[in-house]
Regions:
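Generic, well-ordered alpha-helical scaffold segments in large soluble proteins
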Residues: 78-81, 139
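Structured surface interface patches that mediate subunit assembly and partner/cofactor docking
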Residues: 1-64, 71, 82-99, 113-121, ...
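Basic/polar, acidic-poor N-terminal "presequence/leader" segments
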Residues: 99-106
C-alpha cells in the first residue's frame, strides 16, 4: 500500500504539523500517565494474604506456624479497619485497644528475640506489632523442627518454661484472645479459630494444668472431655505418681479456652463433673490462672 501522504509529496510529520486534530492526538499520546499512589490498604492486604498462604518447609513447623500465621493475619485485618476513636476504646486490664496491642507486642517480643528477629521500629503500635509478628513468622517458618524442642519462657503471671513449639501455640492463643477483646471493645462479633487450632490450644492449656493447681499434688488423674469444635478427651496425671481417675470434667472446648484466657470467671463457668466435685472446682479455678495477662 502506498502512503497517501507520501503520494501527495508530504511526510507524516508534515501532515501533523499542518493538521490541528492530528497534532492534538499526537500530543495526547506523548503525554506521560500521572503516577498513582497505591490504595493505603494494599500493603496490609498483600501481607495478610501472604501470611495466610505461607507454607513452611518442615511439616512439624507447619503445625504450629500456620495457626499463628492465620491469627496474625486476622488481627492485622482487624486493626487495619479501626478508626482513630476505636483505638482509644476501653479494654479491661490494658486500658485501651492501643494499650492492649502494646501488651501483646511485649509478650511476643520474648519469642521474637529468641528467634533473632530485629526490634520493630514502626511508627504506630499497629506497625510495630505487625513488623515483629511478621519477622517472628519468617524465622520460625525457615527454621527446623529440632528448634521447636528448645525450652523458652512462656508469657503470663506464673513463671513457666516450655518448648518453643508450645510457646508458639501460646502466641496463637493470645493473639486470638486479644483480637476477640478488640472485637468486643469495638462492637464486633467474637470469632473462634478453626477447630483443629482450638484443639491445639486446649491441649497446650491442659498440659500446664497440673502445675497450676494449688496445694500439694495429689496422686490421682483427671479426665477432661471438651465438646464441640476442637474438642477431645484427655486424661491428665496430676502428679508423677498419679493413680486412678478421681474426676471427669466436661465443658465446651471454645468456652474452656476462654476460661484459660481469663475471659470467663471460674465461678460462672458452665461445666459438668463426675467424681470429686471439689477437685473439679480446683481444676476450673486453676485453668483460669493460665492466661497471658499481667
Amino acid at each position: 500500500m502506498t502512503d497517501p501522504y507520501l503520494s501527495h509529496g508530504r511526510t507524516p510529520d508534515d501532515h501533523v504539523a499542518a493538521c490541528p486534530h492530528c497534532r492534538a492526538a499526537v500530543a495526547l499520546l506523548d503525554r506521560p500517565e500521572p503516577a498513582l499512589a497505591p490504595p493505603p490498604a494494599l500493603r496490609g492486604t498483600v501481607l495478610s494474604t501472604a501470611r495466610r498462604r505461607r507454607a513452611p518447609a518442615a511439616p512439624g513447623v507447619v503445625t504450629v506456624a500456620a495457626p499463628y500465621a492465620e491469627q496474625v493475619a486476622l488481627m492485622d485485618d482487624l486493626l487495619a479497619g479501626l478508626h482513630g476513636e476505636q483505638w482509644r476504646a476501653p479494654v479491661d486490664r490494658h486500658g485501651t485497644v492501643e494499650g492492649l496491642l502494646e501488651h501483646l507486642t511485649a509478650n511476643d517480643a520474648a519469642i521474637a528475640r529468641f528467634m533473632g528477629a530485629p526490634a520493630a521500629t514502626g511508627a504506630s503500635p499497629h506497625r510495630r506489632w505487625r513488623e515483629q509478628a511478621g519477622a517472628l513468622l519468617e524465622r520460625v517458618s525457615a527454621g527446623s523442627e529440632v528448634l521447636l524442642g528448645v525450652e523458652v519462657a512462656l508469657a503470663g503471671v506464673r513463671p513457666a518454661r516450655a518448648p518453643l513449639r508450645q510457646a508458639l501455640v501460646q502466641r496463637t492463643f493470645e493473639t486470638w484472645t486479644h483480637a476477640d477483646d478488640i472485637r468486643a471493645a469495638t462492637g464486633r462479633s467474637r470469632a473462634a479459630p478453626r477447630a483443629v487450632h482450638v484443639h491445639q490450644i486446649a491441649e497446650f492449656a491442659l498440659a500446664l494444668l497440673p502445675r497450676a493447681l494449688k496445694g500439694p499434688r495429689r496422686a490421682v488423674s483427671a479426665t477432661v472431655v471438651l465438646t464441640g469444635a476442637g474438642g477431645g478427651t484427655w486424661t491428665i496425671p496430676l502428679s508423677p505418681a498419679s493413680g486412678h481417675v478421681a474426676v471427669l470434667l466436661s465443658a465446651e472446648a471454645v468456652d474452656f479456652c476462654r476460661l484459660v484466657a481469663g475471659r470467663w470467671p471460674p465461678g460462672e463457668f458452665p461445666y459438668a463433673a463426675e467424681g470429686e466435685p471439689g477437685l473439679a472446682r480446683d481444676l476450673v479455678e486453676a485453668a483460669a490462672t493460665l492466661g497471658c495477662d499481667r
